[in-house]
C-alpha cells in the first residue's frame, strides 16, 4: 500500500517535470499556454478545450492533476511528448504559411484534429520514425489486463463443481479452502458424509437411482487424475478404489485416520446394525467411520441395499392391509351417520318418506290454492301421499289442502278427459282453525254422485251460462230491496237441500238453519257434513235483512251536534239531536217576497231541519240521497228555509 502510493507520487513528479519542457509548455493543437491534460492515444499535452474535442473522436485523455499514471505510461510519455508527435503527425505542416487554430473556435479545432490525427493529412510518408507502435500496443494490452483484473478481482465465481457441492451440502469447512476445485468438491462431499449421516444416506440413494438410465454427474465423481467420469455402471462397485485414489486421507486401513476430525470420539465404538438397515433413521453410525473408514462404510452400505429393498417390499403389503376407511375427525364416536336427503329424487326405502315440495297431492288436482299446479288429467294413485301438516293456527299453506271435515270429488267425464272438482265444506263458526295432523284424503276411486245431484248441478251451471247478466252493484231504484233476491236464494236453498237430502242421505246431509240474530239479521248457516249443492265451500251466502232490521242498521250517533243526522225517523225521541226546542225559541221571521223571486219552489222545504236519509238509502251506503223528502218530526215553519247544515249560519 505504501509502495504504490510512493510510486504514484514519483510518477506525478516525473509528469510535472515533463510539462516544464519547452515543447510541452504549450498545447500542441492550439498553442495555448499551460496544458493540463495528456492524450494517451498520441502521448501529447493538450489544453482543456482540445481535450474535450479529442474525447469527441474517442481519444483517451487524462488529467495530470486528477488522474493517476502508471510507471509504463510515464515511460512511454517520456519517449513521446509534443515534440515527438510534431515530427510524426505535423511533418508536412508549414509553420510560416499555416496557422494553428485558436481554442475559442471549436469548429476549427475540431477540423484540425480530424485532419491531423484521424485522416493524417500532414503525416510524412516514412513511418519508420513512429515512436511507439509497439509501445502503444504493449501499454494498451497491459492496461486492458489491469482493468480486467481489477474488474474480476472480487467477482470471480468458484468453478461449477465447487459451486454445486457448496449449494448441495452447505458451506465448506475452512480447512479445505486452499485446494483445487475438484479436491474441494471431494472433500466437501467427504466432510458432509462425516458430519451428517442422514445426508450421506440421501446421497447414496440418489446416486443409486439416478444412474440407472444416464451417466453419473461429473460433479459427483470429478477428480483431476481419475478415470472416465461418464461411466454408466449402475451400482458403481469401484467407488471404493476411486475414493482411495482420490483422497489418501481416507484410505482403507484399520488405523483410524479420522482422529483429526473426531479427536475425542474413539470410545464410541458401538455397532448399530439397526441404523444401517433402517431406511428412516441415519444410514451409518460413528463406528463405521472410526473402525473401518470411508471405503468400508460405503461397501457395507452398497451390500445392504439389496436386502433393504427386499425388506421394504415385504413391509408394503402390511401397510396396504392396515389401510382402512379414513377416520373422520369431525365425526363423534357412536354418532349415527346422517344420510343426505334429496328432495328431488326419492331414496330407496327411506325410513320416513320425504316431503316433496315440488309436486302437489294427486287427489287434489284441480284445487285453486295449489301454487305449484299439477296435471289436470292425472289419475289418483293407489296409495295417497302422506303429508305432515303443521299444527299452527292462522298460517297460510300453499301445498296443503284447506281444512275440511270431509271432502268429495265430483267427476264429470266427457270422453277420456276427467275433471275433478273438490267440494269442500264450510266450517261451523265454533270450529277452530287448527289443521288435523293427518288430513283425510279420498280413496283410490272417486265417490260416485247420484243422478239427482248431478242434475241439480247441471241445472245450476246451465242457468249461469244461459243468463250472463252483469252484476249490478249499485241499483238505480231506491225501492229495489235485496230482500226479494235473498228470499229467492232461500227458496232455492230449501228446495235443493230437501231434494238432495231425500235422494241420497247416506253421502250428503244438508240442513238449512234460519235464525234471527240479536240485531235482526237473518243468516243462513250450513253445518259440517253438508255442501251447498255443487258450490265450493268457500262461497258464502249473502245475509238477508228483514224489514225490522232497517231501523237498527245505524244506531251509532255522531258526537258533533252540527253534523248531518243520518238516524232513522223513529229516533226523534232522542233529545240529543232534536231541534224542535231550538226552533221554537227562534222568532218567526217572514222572508220578504223580494228575496224569493229567483228561488224555485222545490228548494223551499216545509221543514227547517234538513231531511234524513231513508232506510234503503242508508242500507245502500247513502248513495241515493233525496233532498226533496221532508221529515215529519216537527211542524212546518213557513216558507223560511236554511240552505246550510248549520242552524246558526
Curated annotation (Swiss-Prot):
The residue ranges flagged as biased composition, category Polar residues, are 248-257, 269-279, 300-315, 366-385
**Any one Pfam family match given in the protein's UniProt record, by short name:** ArfGap
Zn finger (C4-type) start-end: 27-50
State the source organism's domain of life: Eukaryota
Q: Where is the Arf-GAP domain?
A: 12-130
Residues of the region (Disordered) are 124-159, 209-279, 294-316, 366-391
List where this protein forms a coiled coil. none
Known role: GTPase-activating protein (GAP) for ADP ribosylation factor (ARF).
Instruction: State what protein this is by name.
Output: Probable ADP-ribosylation factor GTPase-activating protein AGD14
Amino acid at each position: 500500500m505504501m509502495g504504490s502510493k510512493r510510486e504514484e507520487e514519483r510518477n506525478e513528479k516525473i509528469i510535472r517535470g515533463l510539462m516544464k519542457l519547452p515543447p510541452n509548455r504549450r498545447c500542441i493543437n492550439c498553442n495555448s499556454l499551460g496544458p493540463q491534460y495528456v492524450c494517451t492515444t498520441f502521448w501529447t499535452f493538450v489544453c482543456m478545450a482540445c481535450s474535450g474535442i479529442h474525447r469527441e473522436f474517442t481519444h483517451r485523455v487524462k488529467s495530470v492533476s486528477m488522474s493517476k499514471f502508471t510507471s509504463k505510461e510515464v515511460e512511454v510519455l517520456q519517449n513521446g511528448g509534443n515534440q515527438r508527435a510534431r515530427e510524426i503527425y505535423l511533418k508536412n505542416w508549414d509553420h510560416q504559411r499555416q496557422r494553428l487554430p485558436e481554442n475559442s473556435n471549436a469548429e476549427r479545432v475540431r477540423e484540425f484534429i480530424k485532419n491531423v490525427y484521424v485522416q493524417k493529412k500532414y503525416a510524412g510518408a516514412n513511418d519508420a520514425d513512429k515512436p511507439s507502435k509497439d509501445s502503444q500496443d504493449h501499454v494498451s494490452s497491459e492496461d486492458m489486463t489491469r482493468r480486467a483484473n481489477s474488474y474480476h478481482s472480487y467477482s470471480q465465481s468458484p468453478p461449477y463443481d465447487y459451486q454445486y457441492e457448496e449449494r448441495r451440502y452447505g458451506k465448506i469447512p475452512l480447512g479445505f479452502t486452499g485446494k483445487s476445485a475438484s479436491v474441494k468438491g471431494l472433500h466437501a462431499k467427504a466432510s458432509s458424509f462425516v458430519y451428517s449421516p442422514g445426508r450421506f444416506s440421501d446421497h447414496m440413494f440418489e446416486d443409486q437411482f439416478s444412474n440407472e438410465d444416464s451417466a453419473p454427474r461429473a460433479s459427483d465423481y470429478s477428480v483431476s487424475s481419475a478415470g472416465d467420469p461418464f461411466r454408466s455402471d449402475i451400482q458403481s462397485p469401484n467407488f471404493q478404489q476411486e475414493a482411495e485414489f482420490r483422497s489418501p486421507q481416507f484410505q482403507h486401513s484399520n488405523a483410524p485416520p479420522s482422529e483429526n476430525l473426531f479427536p475425542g470420539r474413539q470410545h464410541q465404538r458401538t455397532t448399530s446394525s439397526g441404523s444401517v438397515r433402517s431406511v428412516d433413521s441415519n444410514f451409518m453410525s460413528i463406528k463405521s467411520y472410526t473402525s473401518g473408514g470411508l471405503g468400508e462404510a460405503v461397501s457395507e452400505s452398497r451390500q445392504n441395499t439389496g436386502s433393504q429393498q427386499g425388506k421394504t417390499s415385504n413391509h408394503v403389503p402390511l401397510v396396504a392391509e392396515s389401510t382402512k376407511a379414513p377416520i373422520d375427525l369431525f365425526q363423534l364416536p357412536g354418532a349415527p351417520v346422517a344420510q343426505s336427503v334429496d328432495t328431488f329424487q326419492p331414496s330407496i326405502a327411506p325410513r320416513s318418506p320425504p316431503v316433496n315440495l315440488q309436486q302437489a297431492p294427486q287427489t287434489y288436482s284441480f284445487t285453486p290454492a295449489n301454487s305449484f299446479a299439477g296435471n289436470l288429467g292425472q289419475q289418483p294413485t293407489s296409495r295417497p301421499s302422506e303429508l305432515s301438516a303443521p299444527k299452527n293456527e292462522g298460517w297460510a299453506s300453499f301445498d296443503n289442502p284447506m281444512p275440511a271435515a270431509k271432502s268429495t270429488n265430483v267427476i264429470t267425464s266427457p270422453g277420456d278427459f276427467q275433471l275433478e272438482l273438490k267440494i269442500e265444506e264450510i266450517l261451523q263458526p265454533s270450529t277452530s282453525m287448527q289443521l288435523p295432523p293427518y288430513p283425510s284424503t279420498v280413496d283410490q276411486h272417486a265417490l260416485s254422485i247420484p243422478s239427482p245431484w248431478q242434475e241439480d248441478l247441471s241445472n245450476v251451471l246451465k242457468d249461469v251460462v244461459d243468463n250472463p247478466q252483469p252484476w249490478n252493484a249499485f241499483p238505480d231504484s231506491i225501492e229495489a230491496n235485496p230482500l226479494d233476491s235473498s228470499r229467492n236464494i232461500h227458496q232455492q236453498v230449501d228446495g235443493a237441500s230437501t231434494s238432495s237430502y231425500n235422494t241420497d242421505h247416506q253421502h250428503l246431509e244438508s240442513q238449512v238453519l234460519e235464525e234471527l240474530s240479536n240485531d235482526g239479521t237473518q243468516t243462513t248457516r250450513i253445518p259440517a257434513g253438508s255442501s251447498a249443492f255443487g258450490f265450493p265451500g268457500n262461497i258464502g251466502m249473502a245475509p238477508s235483512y228483514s224489514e225490522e232490521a232497517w231501523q237498527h242498521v245505524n244506531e251509532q250517533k255522531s258526537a258533533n251536534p252540527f253534523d248531518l243526522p243520518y238516524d232513522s225517523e223513529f229516533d226523534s225521541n232522542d233529545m240529543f239531536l232534536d231541534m224542535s226546542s231550538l226552533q221554537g225559541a227562534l222568532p218567526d221571521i217572514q222572508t220578504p217576497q223580494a228575496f224569493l223571486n229567483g228561488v224555485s219552489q222545490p228548494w223551499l222545504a216545509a221543514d227547517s231541519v234538513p231531511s234524513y236519509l231513508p232506510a234503503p238509502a242508508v242500507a245502500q251506503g247513502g248513495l241515493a240521497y233525496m233532498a226533496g223528502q221532508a221529515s215529519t218530526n216537527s211542524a212546518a215553519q213557513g216558507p223560511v228555509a236554511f240552505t246550510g247544515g248549520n242552524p246558526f249560519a
